[in-house]
A protein has these predicted regions:
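Juxtamembrane transmembrane-helix termini in multi-pass membrane transport proteins
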Residues: 2-73, 132-152, 161
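Select subsegments of transmembrane alpha-helices in polytopic membrane proteins
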Residues: 45-52, 113-126, 183-186
């Protein structure tokens, strides 16, 4: 692979990582309401989910999923239902008041990891992203470069998302006082993204 091709992919991957989306919302909300440790759990889950889709794409499994309309739709609808569930849960939480000294149980890193992982695994568009992007940059007959490109994309995410966590941590004291509003906003985003995933054309 040429240096120009690698840099081109890195730029595309960087723009993808920086573009606000579901991962950004998940990480910011978790960092603001549950703290840095839980937010890092979400980041690890997101990264593992992307890794699973990337490996599946390189192995040709994502192509099979995309070729089967029923299988694709089942995964898509499950993902949409999960996002709407997260939105409903956030809306329910908005009924409760929280303070910095609140002793309510906070989800651990493991529980947060599962949320990040499930959110990505139940979104077939992550797999389609890898399936459509990687072949454009991989040299013919050199599949090992696929692993390099995936590592670049995941590495950029592992740099950017923790930066968001640090920024959110600085605003946490203020925004915790606005938890009801924050929950309602993120609930609206989750439900909107769930409906978009459910009804969006392939």
């Amino acid at each position: 692979m040429s240096t120009a091709a690698l840099l081109s992919f890195s730029l595309v991957a960087l723009l993808t990582v920086l573009t606000p989306g579901l991962d950004t919302v998940m990480v910011l909300r978790t960092a603001l309401l549950n703290g840095k440790r839980a937010a890092m759990g979400v980041v690890v889950g997101i990264t593992l989910g992307c890794l699973v889709w990337a490996v599946a794409s390189l192995a040709g499994l994502t192509a099979l999923l995309q070729a089967s309309e029923l299988a694709y739709d089942v995964v898509r609808w499950l993902g949409a239902a999960y996002l709407i569930y997260l939105g409903a849960k956030a809306l329910w939480n908005s009924r409760k008041s929280v303070s910095l000294d609140d002793s309510r149980p906070v989800p651990g890193a493991g529980a947060s990891l599962r949320v990040g992982l499930l959110t990505n695994l139940l979104n077939p568009k992550v797999g389609v992203f890898y399936l459509s992007l990687l072949p454009q940059f991989m040299p013919a007959g050199e599949p090992a470069w696929g692993a390099v490109l995936v590592a670049v994309h995941l590495g950029l995410g592992l740099v950017w998302l923790p930066i968001l966590i640090v920024v959110a941590g600085r605003a946490r004291a203020f925004l915790l006082r606005q938890q009801a509003l924050l929950d309602r906003l993120t609930a609206s985003v989750f439900v909107a993204l769930g409906l978009k995933l459910a009804f969006e054309a392939r």
